Amino acid sequence: MSKETTFADAVVEALNRAKILGVRAGTEHRYTGVWTVVVDGRVFARSWNDKPTGWFRAFRKQPSGTIQAGDLEIPVRAKLVRSARIRDAVTAAFAEKYNTKGSRKWVEGFAEPERVVNTIEFVPG
């Protein structure tokens, strides 16, 4: 397991540029496309729901996994975000990054309290 607590700047930039990343808990799950945002150099995702078979619940059960961005496959650990300040910053970052008319419904949905609690941070794994 990596002792690093933050990703290299080049990795953060690549993750920030990507609109959709593949995420996979463990090694047996398939990659699932998710929206991610970067806040203060840290990488976050938020699940639309908390289904027992979904990616969010898989990371809650098995925090180690992989992020896929283009040709990059990056080992990660997922950490549940409890800080209201960080959750609010993530909500704002979603609105800024995904600012098209077609994204509006999803951005507004991600701001709902039942989804805000589904915020995780990816750290080097």
Can you say where each PLM-predicted feature lies in the sequence?
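Extreme N-terminal tail/first-helix region
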Residues: M1-L21
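Short, structured beta-strand-loop surface elements
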Residues: H29, D50-G125
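Short beta-strand segments
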Residues: R17-N49, R57
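A generic local structural motif
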Residues: F7-A10, R30-T32, V107-E108
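Serine/threonine-rich low-complexity intrinsically disordered regions
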Residues: T6, D40, T100-S103
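General secondary-structure edge motif
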Residues: K3, N16-R17, V39-D40, G70, ...
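Short secondary-structure boundary/capping segments
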Residues: V12-E13, W35, F110-E112
